[in-house]
Amino acid sequence: MWGSSSSSAKKSRRKSKSSMSGAIDEAAAEAIFAELADEEDPTVIELDGIATLCEKLDLDPESDIRILVLLWKLGSNEKPAQISKEEFMDGCHNLQLDSIEKFRNLLPALDTGFLDQDEFKSFYKFCFQFNRQGTHRTLDKDMVVALWQMVLKDRIPDERLETFCEFTETQKSYTRITLDQWTSFLDFCHECEDLSTYDESMSAWPVLIDEYVEYMEEKQKK
């Protein structure tokens, strides 16, 4: 599941990092990247390499959110479903990682409970963007539901998560979910804890949210 700068400026930034106290063993970090890198394009780690990293860290990529937190913290954002060598190396410098053991030691800190609301909002958006396929700007509904169940567990009330996933799964008119719908659901959960206060005429929520509220109202009447 899943401003411009010159090359000399990039080298300068890397050089300044290596001169900092507590600098990492850059050759060791590069060796980790090389082991995980794609065979056809050794400048990136793609899903197969990420799966290999999960094996080394004893993480289940299908259910353990910590792999997504790790990729977010490393700085994967250039393209979906991959991390470039520059992103990986910059992330290793920032997180002081130059061995698989250090990656393992970082795992306890990757719990989303350690993220404040703004950090989680950034991470939540990353989860959508990282799991896009190719040039698609939307995600398949089934993938979105699985992501919601993994990413929002323990972040929003269980009932809201369960009913929204149930609603989304049953709506035949929605086969794919947009980034706006994805991000709006999290905002909606924070801003409208009680559905009785929801006012469709005063809101600017996507239609998906309006229809969810109607769905819940009908459900409560039964």
Question: Where in the sequence are the language-model features?
Answer:
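Acidic Ca2+-chelating loop motifs
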Residues: 39-50, 65, 76-93, 133-144, ...
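Compositionally biased, low-structure terminal segments
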Residues: 34, 89, 162-168, 183-186, ...
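Plant-biased recognition of short, low-complexity, intrinsically disordered N-terminal tails
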Residues: 1-34
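Amphipathic alpha-helical assembly/oligomerization segments
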Residues: 126-131
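C-terminal helix/juxtamembrane-tail motif
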Residues: 205-222
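Predominantly extracellular/lumenal beta-strand repeat domains
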Residues: 2, 10, 51, 99-100
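EF-hand-based Ca2+ sensing modules
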Residues: 22-31, 53-83, 94-120, 124, ...
